[in-house]
Amino acid sequence: MAVLAGKGDDLETVVEQVLATRDRVVVERAGAPAAIMMSLRELEGLEYSIELLSEPKMVRRILEGEAALQSGNLYMGEELAALDPEARFVVRTLTGGLSLAPTPRAAGDDSWGLCASMPSRKALDELQFHVADATRNFVFGRLLAEPAAAGVELHGFLARRLATRVETALVIYRLDSVKRLVRLVEILNIGGMVGRTDNHHW
């Protein structure tokens, strides 16, 4: 629910509230709603959601990626090497101690595993070389290291999915917090879509 911010409210306090609670704060002027304050992460999630929902082809690709994951058409464990044929990024992930598959974890182990839909691998191969490399670096790096912070949440029909822009690619994924598993749904070539032009550094 939106929280009204009157003239006497301290801006820094309101910003802290927005970041801590994810409230959308309505700013009043002359007693009437004049503007809304929300976190940058939420704004970008809304922008991506609107852009994606206006492109039926992209929505269809996301749903096809979801269907592939649910039907078992996916890569996991050692099979994930298919996403990185030259083994420049996946090897670094393994030697860095990050997991690539859901496995029993000791108490206190907060690492995340990864599985990827077959359509996402095909999409990765179709990207320009430098974009594909940057995307692999993200997937086998920051995405596994801090998946919740690495992307922004989508809204509406696309809710419960996260998105991150890397160069001209938009990485769509889900988080399974019970299995601590990142599910890579699809990688979209978005070109001039709104949002940042590189991967997020929140």
Across the structure, where does each feature detected by a protein language model lie?
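Short amphipathic alpha-helical segments
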Residues: V27-G31, T135, V139-F140
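A short, surface-exposed loop/turn module that caps and links secondary-structure elements
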Residues: L83, N137-R165
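Arg/Lys-rich, positively charged N-terminal/basic patches that mediate binding to nucleic acids
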Residues: V90-V139
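Short, charge-rich, low-complexity interaction segments located
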Residues: R24-L63, F89-S99, T103, G151-V152, ...
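Enriched for short, Lys/Arg-rich terminal
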Residues: E51-E55, L100-S111, L162-W202
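Bateman/CBS regulatory modules and CBS-like beta-alpha motifs in cytosolic regions of diverse proteins
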Residues: M1-V18, E28, M38, R61-E79
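Non-catalytic interaction/Regulatory regions outside core domains
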Residues: M1-A5, D9, E78, A82-A106
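Short, small/polar residue-rich loop motifs at catalytic or cofactor-binding pockets
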Residues: L19-T21, D109
